[in-house]
């Protein structure tokens, strides 16, 4: 067995022992040893391999798989710009704490700076965005003694375990991306004399990892008196806190569902005396204003070592609350009434509005979801719209790229999440805007030999541009002569034609037909396009606020 083949087989075997179940592979020459080893493992049923031609979409496919599987996922690519194209996914994985492993094949390091083809200083390219930069080191030339090879087997497996531990946060309680750079020398393909059954040097008995690391316990109790009028703000990455479940809770869609829900717009009707912040809230301006109020104490509870504090207003941080006191019943009733009033205001104005908007599409999707479903949301208006229409259920798993909240890679994220969710038999519905869809439309490219979602519906709310800017300062009517072009960015893309190019079923429907369409029995991946209007969004939201 040549050195690069041995090295790749050891790495793949040890990744599987560390909990990797899915790997996304992008084709290339330098990563050929990894490609052969991954294909052999896929054929043996030890992992599931997904081949993609675009490293950028491959990274987000891996994020969707990792988030839904709650397990580390690898992306393997060749050297050069293939590595650089992982940049957006690595940044998202960093801030969303997703265990993404970048398996970057490299030329032998002595070729750096020599002008060798497809070579740059890629080890460490991601800088502070990764939990660790780990190099496997170059395998020795062919002909190394069996004794040396045995020692290298342990070194390679130990390094691979370090990669998995860093990605999963087993010792830090801070999962995230890791770069595992593997320089590979020629030959890059298995020897002609290879046995029919691929062989790898032995690991530990019974499939155990070479170096076992139990998950770290990260526990920081924080005393909180619940006697003051308290609200909970639960954002992305929030943990589950049963002793806070009775408190009025503004829960963003990706947070655990609230047992005592409080609509984000209801904050305009009440005056909390303190806030318990869970995770990292990013969606609603009334929430941001409350968290920035210096007269309102904020207690931050997170599941890892970092905590958000945009306004610098948090008084204390921890991982769980040790509570004393109890909220006044009058306060709980006031919040419940404010929640009902806010939900009614939104739904009432939706019914009265003469045009279909993205908010109408979100309401139709929310009402059509079933227990056991998975919902993937675009990071712009869709995730906000779902929150505004009053969606909150513990029976639906909600995903969205909230790490740095970019729209890039959302189609690929949805496909990855669907492929993972289908292992439990559930279906996935993705709600995204047209810009988000077009931006990552290449994510629809799935080769005929690759795993394909069997229960994925992508709902595209198509208002021909960036509807979110209608609701921001840029959407002020005084900028109407320029805002449509430079912020709205109309594109006139034919969504149906785009889907046909990728052999994906699609059809255009009215919002009133969406519930029936989502209730259909369907096998495969499809796109449902709903035309929407964005010119009236500003007026619709103003009418909702006026009716609070």
Curated annotation (Swiss-Prot):
- Catalytic reaction equation(s): isochorismate + 2-oxoglutarate + H(+) = 5-enolpyruvoyl-6-hydroxy-2-succinyl-cyclohex-3-ene-1-carboxylate + CO2
> Is the ATP-binding keyword given for this protein?
no
Q: How is the cofactor bound?
A: Binds 1 thiamine pyrophosphate per subunit.
CDD domains reported for this sequence:
TPP_PYR_MenD, TPP_SHCHC_synthase
Required cofactors, per record?
A: Mg(2+); Mn(2+); thiamine diphosphate
Would you say which domain of life the source belongs to?
Answer: Bacteria
Q: What GO biological process terms does the UniProt entry carry, in alphabetical order? A: menaquinone biosynthetic process
**Mind listing the GO molecular function terms for this protein?**
2-succinyl-5-enolpyruvyl-6-hydroxy-3-cyclohexene-1-carboxylic-acid synthase activity; magnesium ion binding; manganese ion binding; thiamine pyrophosphate binding
Instruction: List UniProt keywords, sorted A-Z.
Output: Magnesium, Manganese, Menaquinone biosynthesis, Metal-binding, Thiamine pyrophosphate, Transferase
Q: Which SUPFAM superfamilies match?
A: Thiamin diphosphate-binding fold (THDP-binding) (SSF52518)
Family designation: Belongs to the TPP enzyme family. MenD subfamily.
Function statement: Catalyzes the thiamine diphosphate-dependent decarboxylation of 2-oxoglutarate and the subsequent addition of the resulting succinic semialdehyde-thiamine pyrophosphate anion to isochorismate to yield 2-succinyl-5-enolpyruvyl-6-hydroxy-3-cyclohexene-1-carboxylate (SEPHCHC).
Subunit structure of this chain's protein: Homodimer.
Question: What NCBIfam families does UniProt report for this protein, alphabetically?
Answer: menD
Report what the protein is called: 2-succinyl-5-enolpyruvyl-6-hydroxy-3-cyclohexene-1-carboxylate synthase
Source species of the chain: Mycolicibacterium vanbaalenii (strain DSM 7251 / JCM 13017 / BCRC 16820 / KCTC 9966 / NRRL B-24157 / PYR-1) (Mycobacterium vanbaalenii)
